[in-house]
Amino acid sequence: MKRTSRMFSNAATLAFLAAGVFALSAPLATAAEQSADDPVPTEEITAALKGMGHAPFPIGKPNSGYAQYFTGNSYLQPLAGGSGINVANVTFAPGTINRWHKHSKSCQVLVGVSGVGWYQIWGEKPQKMEPGTTVTIPEGVKHWHGASGGAWFQHLSIMLDGAGTEWLEPVDPAEYAKLNEAAK
């Protein structure tokens, strides 16, 4: 019983912070804010995202530390951390998704920022994510998320400091392909 109430408390706290970060940070940051020596094709990615609506957060650097858990290119831009909550903008190239995984010591709040993506909780149907879609994945629940087959996608990831990730098997490529085909 305590675990459920704590999980709800964490989820409620993270959802509240997600809304605040999204509302307050969007006017302050632009996707063009990258260092001059950064090899990321920032202008190309930003143009693609703006063509789908907007790109309010910096794209970040290649997510090379976690590349083995993604099917293609992803970029990570930390936005806040060190105060009990970690907030990052994750940018997925078209067709890029992560493996099935689960988090410990925190739920995960995902907030769609730009483009079109998917998330799926184990045993449930995949759900579309678009700008403004907010999802709370409870602690310990197996899931995946990422871009649709034909669009760039950005989401905020919000978790408590000290959260862990257990990476599991890849998403079935045939199931992902069917999902994208059905969405056309």
Where are these regions (language model features)?
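Bacterial N-terminal signal peptides
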Residues: 12-26
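Bacterial N-terminal signal peptides that target proteins for export
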Residues: 2-15
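Conserved hydrophobic/aromatic beta-strand scaffold that supports enzyme active sites
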Residues: 78, 87-91, 109, 126, ...
